[in-house]
């Protein structure tokens, strides 16, 4: 049995799972492509910093992790995306060590199939559907 050394790993908070989980070059069958696996937390780090222009400190706080851990995740994500774009690889998005951040609209939540606040992959909605 293996034991981890150091501090226990904490779950990274993400806003939601992405709607699209696969990107590939046009005109090449999937079977002929190498792929890069981008975890959900790596995608979230790119979303927060590169898409929403959050400073690293704020983005790390949103994900519930230290700035150092955030920087390592972001660096890994950028390297994978650059490799896929330059070398024509497929990007497969999935996995990781995460949980979906609470949306803070519990009291007003009136979800049918969709959230009026734009949270498309809500845990409460999933739990309600499975009951």
From Swiss-Prot:
InterPro entries: UPF0251. It holds the Pfam family DUF134. PANTHER family: PTHR37478, UPF0251 PROTEIN TK0562 (PTHR37478:SF2). HAMAP family: UPF0251. Belongs to the UPF0251 family. This is UPF0251 protein MMP0619. It comes from Methanococcus maripaludis (strain DSM 14266 / JCM 13030 / NBRC 101832 / S2 / LL).
């Amino acid at each position: 049995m293996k034991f981890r050394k150091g501090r226990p790993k904490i779950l990274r908070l993400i806003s939601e799972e992405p709607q699209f989980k696969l990107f590939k070059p046009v005109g090449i069958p999937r079977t002929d492509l190498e792929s890069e696996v981008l975890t959900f937390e790596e995608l979230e780090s790119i979303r927060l910093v590169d898409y929403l222009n959050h400073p690293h400190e704020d983005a790390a706080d949103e994900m519930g992790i230290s700035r150092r851990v955030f920087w390592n995740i972001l660096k890994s994500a950028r390297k994978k995306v650059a490799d896929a774009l330059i070398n024509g690889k497929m990007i497969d998005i999935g996995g990781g060590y995460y949980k979906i951040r609470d949306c803070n609209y519990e009291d007003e939540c009136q979800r049918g199939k969709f959230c009026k606040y734009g949270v498309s992959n809500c845990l409460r909605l999933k739990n309600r559907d499975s009951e």
